[in-house]
């Protein structure tokens, strides 16, 4: 890791969230039953859309939509899909000047088969795992208040240096967060426990939390994870809302928000953005959970992860209407 330049005082830093993560588009195939039939059988579906994909990019768009000044560091290929992603992120207010274009590897992509309530995902990784520690511009770190890492298990080149990267961020006065997302190898290791020691907010879903810890109980999993070092572990539980366990052992629960869901792609990433919007504003864990649930739920009203992401006033209003906020 190269030496960091002197960081600006917190009050003068002009990036609220610096996102380190993967970047790729999604091709969303939507139907009541999107299961394909082989033997050259053609089936008609409701829609096929090319949209902003990748958990980290969806998170970044959600954070920007909520009013956080957001910058992104990732890798794309020198191809139409990479240009599509960079242009789409810029259009949503995300600073992508720190992204690297790889001339040799194509941009990754995911095909998502969704019925609205559930989905299957096929992914060609491409440039997704190629982000390296040396790709992170130190000038951006010096301007940031917070570093968020998306899809820890997919960032193969960065992951071995990630604990050190987050530790350096802490020493420079930043706070940190991470979402692991699903481990495609299903080993649930890869240095995660060391990374958690340098993570202030950890944001897995229920399936990920229980797989990582080898437990079947979500609350027990959250307690094991928070013991590894985070200030708070917030676990997304789908229709059951979300829970959080703080370092002092306090458990907080928030129920789900009823919406007419069209597509659940990226709902967890929008939850992360809502939770961190509260965290960075110094709000209590209950408020952070409520904002996360509201942001995640409202994001499901449109196709793709970003089309229906709410503003902060929209998320707060929805949370209040549901009794999640006073």
Where are the language model's segments positioned?
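Glycine-rich phosphate/adenosyl-contacting loop at the front of the ribokinase-like
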Residues: 1-75, 80-87, 91, 260-262, ...
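Conserved phosphate-binding/catalytic region of the ribokinase-like
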Residues: 2-18, 29, 168, 218-326
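Structural detector of well-ordered beta-strand residues that form the stable sheet scaffold
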Residues: 18, 71, 176-177, 234
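Conserved phosphate/ATP/ADP-binding segment of small-molecule kinases
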Residues: 166-175, 181-253
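A short, aliphatic-rich alpha-helical micro-motif
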Residues: 12, 140-144, 196
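Active-site metal-binding loops of divalent metal-dependent hydrolases
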Residues: 23, 152, 270
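Conserved N-terminal subdomain of the carbohydrate kinase-like
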Residues: 35, 40-43, 50, 65-149, ...
């Amino acid at each position: 890791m190269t030496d960091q330049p002197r960081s600006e005082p917190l009050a003068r830093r002009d990036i609220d969230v610096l996102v380190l993560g993967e970047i790729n588009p999604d091709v969303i195939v939507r139907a009541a039953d999107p299961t394909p039939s082989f033997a050259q059988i053609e089936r008609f579906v409701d829609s096929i859309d090319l949209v902003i994909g990748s958990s980290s990019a969806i998170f970044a768009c959600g954070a920007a939509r909520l009013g956080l000044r957001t910058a992104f560091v990732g890798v794309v290929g020198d191809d139409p899909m990479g240009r599509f992603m960079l242009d789409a992120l810029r259009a949503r207010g995300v600073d992508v000047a720190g992204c690297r274009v790889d001339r040799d590897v194509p941009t990754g992509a995911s095909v998502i088969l969704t019925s609205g309530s559930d989905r299957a995902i096929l992914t060609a990784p491409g440039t997704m795992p190629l982000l390296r520690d040396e790709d992170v511009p130190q000038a951006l770190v010096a301007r940031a208040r917070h570093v968020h890492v998306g899809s820890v298990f997919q960032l193969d080149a960065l992951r071995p240096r990630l604990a050190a990267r987050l530790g350096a961020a802490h020493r420079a006065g930043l706070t940190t967060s991470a979402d692991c997302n699903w481990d495609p190898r299903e080993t649930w290791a890869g240095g995660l426990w060391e990374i958690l020691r340098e993570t202030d907010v950890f944001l897995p879903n229920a399936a990920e939390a229980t797989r990582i810890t080898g437990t079947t109980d979500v609350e027990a999993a959250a307690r094991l994870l928070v013991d590894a070092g985070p200030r708070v572990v917030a676990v997304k539980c789908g229709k059951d809302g979300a829970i959080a366990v703080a370092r002092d052992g306090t458990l907080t629960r928030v129920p789900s928000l009823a919406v007419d869901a069209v597509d659940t792609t990226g709902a967890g990433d929008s939850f992360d953005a809502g939770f961190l919007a509260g965290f960075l504003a110094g709000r209590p864990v209950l408020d952070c959970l409520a904002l996360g649930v509201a942001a995640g739920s409202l994001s499901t009203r449109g196709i793709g992860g970003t089309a229906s992401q709410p503003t902060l006033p929209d998320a707060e209003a929805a949370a209040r209407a549901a009794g999640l906020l006073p």
